[in-house]
Amino acid sequence: MQLLPWGGKITSESLRFFSPIVIWTIFEPTERNHHVLYSALLDYYKVWLQLTDQATEENDTTKVVRNREAQHRYLTWRAEKDPGFPLLKKLIGESHAKDLVTEFLFEGVYSLGSKSFLDYFPEYARDDGTVNKKRSMIGKSFEARPWDATGEFIGGKDAG
């Protein structure tokens, strides 16, 4: 298995939402690199198709509620902390950027649950009740891949 180059800093808070096989990369736009990335995308897609073929409907209400809340928690995180939001805001204005993020990119923020960002992540609360806009409250980020080739977490103490 070939590992793509790590794409730069990712906060430890964001890391909890990703698996060890996440594609988080930046590389030179060469034909070979595009082929490698496209091949990885196809591999992901094939596995996704296999998983959806094997999926069965979950009838355990507790599991359904837990899964829905986990998805809502992720969408709520991304809608609030999406690193592309400042660029979108400059391009299309704050109101349109917010709509794009919450109604398209991370649709489900308003329909899957009613908890707010601060309900899930109270450590981001400011004294006035607003959300602290810092990307990381823990202060750790990973500039290098925090997992080895087998998926073992190796990030630990050397996070910067």
Language-model features, listed with the residues they occupy:
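Mixed-charge (acidic/basic) macromolecular-recognition segments
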Residues: 1-83
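Alpha-helical oligomerization segments
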Residues: 61-160
